[in-house]
Amino acid sequence: MKYLFSIIILLSMGWTTDSSFIFSEKTKLDPCPNSPNCVSTQETRKRKRMRPILFTESSDLAIEKLERMLASKSRVTLVEKKGNYLHYEFKTKIGKFIDDVEFLFDEETKQIHFRSASRKGYGDFGKNKRRMKKIRKEYEK
């Protein structure tokens, strides 16, 4: 009976788990929506595109550096860390709106790609772009 139960558990784990997803690294961020409240380094539309953050150390050290930098900021929460990918929530001071900021570290090109987008509303008065310029400047100094 124990043997049968073990087999059922193992089979159900196989049906609910996609191991290729678990062990693969993210290589691309989602595109920005048509609304003006999003910027990304991988965006094809010029008005939404920003240049990536550059790093010289290994991607592991670059991830640690960015994590330390963002940990010192208020209203910033790490939501997910998976391989070369980080996802943060930034809560705005006024209105307590949440913006999603994602980082993707490319070891080969020594670039940190990012996407910063407001969860709600249509416009952001340029907040996402200003935030990412500030983060890039602080990281690269």
Model region roles, listed by residue range:
Residues G14-K141:
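Ser/Thr-rich, low-complexity intrinsically disordered terminal regions
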